[in-house]
């Protein structure tokens, strides 16, 4: 199989090297061909928060290095603020032009091992009539030594279905050329005993900016986390959970 890996990144150097390590190993030694396309982009909501177009950490420098060393087959830099799906569509068009069989979307705080990737693709290969697959994550939060279960987003999408994969119309949401929304197509969840992927998500180290972004995007009460300005740390937004009648997540210690 030929796999197209796509991602959009901005100010994400904290876990970037760890994120791409498994993919670099797979590209060099894996059973299947991997075509990688990343785009550097600052989301539109961040423009309203005063963020510059260019990252102020080492993200762009690292992307440049991955491209020059051959891990990235395509690397684009957006010269304007794009929504996530608009940025990812740049990457999607790149990998589709390379004739990939599946498109795999990732966030650059998701840490797949070589074994995770290999086992997931074996599962995909065993289910050729399935159009898309969800992946289970361990969402590491706060100090990074505890995690939350239950996050299982769509990640892998078959290209040769419904006239071909066309584009993203929202963050992780695809439509096919015949107008079929991927949600209407057959899907499977990759079982946890095959892969339960490490996701360095809502942490004290990155939480303040994420809360500000989510509030700008979803409204003042639209984020399940809050930033405690007195203690300078991330906390659960209890008002959000009460308002939506959602129990607070269970924290699992490492």
For the regions a protein language model found, what residue spans apply to each?
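A conserved hydrophobic helix/loop-capping motif in glycosyltransferases and polysaccharide synthases
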Residues: 3-15, 19, 26, 39
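Short beta-strand-to-loop acidic/aromatic patch adjacent to the donor-nucleotide binding site
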Residues: 99-113
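Active-site-proximal specificity loops/subdomain of glycosyltransferases
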Residues: 38-100
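Short, acidic, metal-binding catalytic loop of nucleotide-sugar glycosyltransferases
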Residues: 21-33, 41-51
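Acidic-and-aromatic substrate-binding clefts and catalytic sites of carbohydrate-active enzymes
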Residues: 13-16, 79-84, 111
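Catalytic-site signature of metal-activated, phosphate-bearing donor transferases
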Residues: 84-89, 111-254
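Residue-level recognition of the N-termini of beta-strands and the immediately preceding loop/turn
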Residues: 2-3, 32-36, 72-73, 101-103, ...
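Residue-level signal for alpha-helix termini/capping positions
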Residues: 24, 28, 96-97, 125
